[in-house]
Amino acid sequence: MSIATGDFRSKVTSSTLLDKKSKHDPITCLTAYDYSTARLVDEAGIDMILVGDSLAQTMLGYENTLPVTMDEMLHHTRAVRRAVRHAFLIADMPYASYHVGGRESVRNAARFIKEGGAEAVKIEGGENRAALIDRLLDAEVPVVGHIGLTPQSVHRMGGYKVQGKTIRDIEQLMRDATALDRAGVVALVLEGIPREVAAMITAEVETPTIGIGAGPDCDGQVLVFHDILNLTFAPPAKFVRRYADAAELITGAVKAFRDDVKTGSYPSDDESYHLPKEAQATLEMVQNRKHAMRK
């Protein structure tokens, strides 16, 4: 039996994603890192929720995604799982959790399914990950691939740079996409690559492609929740579209609370609890006793 939210939407599964690709029905994906955010995103009708290792920056204040740990990722994945009823839930495997040999990599991935409640894990890399993906699928761990600009490779790439600009790089991206598609990934994230290259990959592979900075021709799009609400403290990437200024709204609300406390207008009498009238006499008796004891 499928789980449905109040509006009776059916649960999104890996089969749903394939069906959407075949019908040219765009797939939506956002990140979420906590219960409240995940509940809002899920109830808004987003198809996929990614507990991204970007939480290293958005939630924990790190400079990049590399420092976040397995325990931190599992902690946030469990919180999101408790909120999600509709979306397909994916957890990012953090840096050095799947670069450590096949057996330990499988064990780490399985923890996201068993302990975190994720329905798939996302790993970065191309054809060099095909063998690992085979092992993960053998262990009943669905995998989402991620090629192009892979943030965990920031030092090797020399920064966050658009990938796939040369013939050689385009050919490598095609080999990566084909290898992951054949390996059986349930979706493939294409990040930071030219629109034309993303369109070519999308037409070539059977798995749904999810773009982030890869143009409009992918099967779906993903953005970071904090980016679309202006809750980050750095200039946005070119591909980010901001849909609200939550930073301004939140700052305004916090300042208003501060001012109300300072001026004494919060809390008001209506926002305070009161003794019932019959108990007020008892309070007066207690106060009178205290006064008598002081004399």
Curated annotation (Swiss-Prot):
Binding site residues for 3-methyl-2-oxobutanoate: 53-54, 92, 122
Keyword Metal-binding attributed: yes
Record's cofactor remark: Binds 1 Mg(2+) ion per subunit.
InterPro entries: Pantoate_hydroxy_MeTrfase (IPR003700), Pyrv/PenolPyrv_kinase-like_dom (IPR015813), Pyrv_kinase-like_dom_sf (IPR040442)
Record pathway: Cofactor biosynthesis; (R)-pantothenate biosynthesis; (R)-pantoate from 3-methyl-2-oxobutanoate: step 1/2
A GO molecular function held by the record: 3-methyl-2-oxobutanoate hydroxymethyltransferase activity
Keyword Heme set for record: no
Binding site for Mg(2+): 53, 92, 124
Active site (UniProt): 191
Example GO biological process: pantothenate biosynthetic process
Function, in words: Catalyzes the reversible reaction in which hydroxymethyl group from 5,10-methylenetetrahydrofolate is transferred onto alpha-ketoisovalerate to form ketopantoate.
Similarity remark: Belongs to the PanB family.
Name of protein: 3-methyl-2-oxobutanoate hydroxymethyltransferase
Organism the protein comes from: Koribacter versatilis (strain Ellin345)
